[in-house]
């Protein structure tokens, strides 16, 4: 009998009804169907077993290991330390590149670059723009609770604002439908205020009213004045598209609406912590997690000296540094250390001079530049003061975009102008350096972050 198995019998995964099994000497068609069905079931079971094994391997060796590492760090901390998740702008940028069919343009531009054409040969002009997307934004997500019944919320940890707000059960706008909502009627520690308020951000506006209740961060709780948000329409599409519920401001009191002390300062005022400071540690090997410590400094997060730079303004975490890139220099520039920025922003004129002869290509319609990851012409940033010197090598400001093209990287550097020449030292800087935000001494501490704990 012919039991030859032909490859095309399996082209759809399961055995075809008119396959070579018809060559078997089986008179009963029902028995033949049972055998075929048995093979199909066996195939499905085998496939499911392989997939379950793969899932278990990933869970055991990646996710579980990451959770265990984070829990070990939190357990051994001397001060209140909480883990947080990082949502980078990288995925949103790539989505936009694909949505607007820019992938081929970028590849073609890189071909121009490889052919020896100058950087001015790119597709798209310097004035092109895609609106309504804050590409420079990065979000640090941390968890906290509100009310004596500890209603859970996920917050953006934002050094560029100073109020805490949560969406209220009284919110009727569409953005609130998928969020955790604060219900004051379920908390015995709620105190009514009712003062109406509106919060303005770069991404939009939210409005609501002040309330007071117990706020818990980690194992610390305190009565705190915050905003119940009832209208998020002005904050769209950012709010609906993201996974956070509210914002926990870590800026200065002068930034706050209603002259509310930042929560870290209020923790010290109520003798919950010894020092009014917080720190950020972002592991280099894990782009999606970080650690916020409140009230003290965990020395195991950094190595070498911890250098402090005095603030030049009690509004943002803004210090004065001299900026050098090659022979380009800007003395006494404002430098804002910011947890809400995924890039290094530099004055436009400074950026244009820096990019000359670097073999980079502008991404059409977007404020970004692409280059080959092994581009040896890329420079090192140097920020200096009387107290210290802080460098940022290409490996820290390059973002690999292999899914656009092999060997391609994007520069996490954006041109941005302020009335006074200003640099924003965002995620690339904060991944290389452990940072301390010290309210008591009006300063920012900077030390080399440990690559491995």
From Swiss-Prot:
EC number of the protein: 3.4.23.39
Peptidase A1 domain mapped to chain residues: 140-447
Notes on how activity is controlled: Inhibited by pepstatin A.
Any one Gene Ontology molecular-function term assigned to this protein's record: aspartic-type endopeptidase activity
Residue span(s) of the pro-peptide: 1-124
Organism: Plasmodium falciparum (isolate HB3)
The record's account of how the chain is modified after translation: Not N-glycosylated.
Entry annotated with the keyword Repeat: no
Pfam families: Asp (PF00026)
Gene: PMII
Residue intervals annotated with topology Lumenal: 59-453
TM regions (residue ranges): 38-58
Name of the featured protein: Plasmepsin II
Domain of life: Eukaryota
Cellular component GO terms held in the UniProt record: cytostome; food vacuole; vacuolar lumen; vacuolar membrane
Subcellular location: Membrane; Vacuole lumen; Vacuole membrane
Complex formation: Component of the hemozoin formation complex (HFC) composed of falcipains FP2A and/or FP2B, plasmepsins PMII, PMIII/HAP and PMIV, heme detoxifying protein HDP and falcilysin FLN. The HFC complex is involved in hemoglobin degradation and detoxification of heme in the food vacuole during the asexual blood stage.
InterPro entries reported in the protein's UniProt record: Aspartic_peptidase_A1 (IPR001461), Aspartic_peptidase_AS (IPR001969), Pepsin-like_dom (IPR034164), PEPTIDASE_A1 (IPR033121), Peptidase_aspartic_dom_sf (IPR021109)
Entry's Gene Ontology BP terms: acquisition of nutrients from host; proteolysis
Substrates-to-products reaction catalysed: Hydrolysis of the bonds linking certain hydrophobic residues in hemoglobin or globin. Also cleaves small molecules substrates such as Ala-Leu-Glu-Arg-Thr-Phe-|-Phe(NO2)-Ser-Phe-Pro-Thr
Active site per the UniProt annotation: 158, 338
Keywords: Aspartyl protease, Disulfide bond, Hydrolase, Membrane, Protease, Signal-anchor, Transmembrane, Transmembrane helix, Vacuole, Zymogen
Cysteines engaged in disulfide bonds, as pairs: 171-176, 373-409
Principal EC category: hydrolase
Membrane-topology annotation of the record: Single-pass type II membrane protein
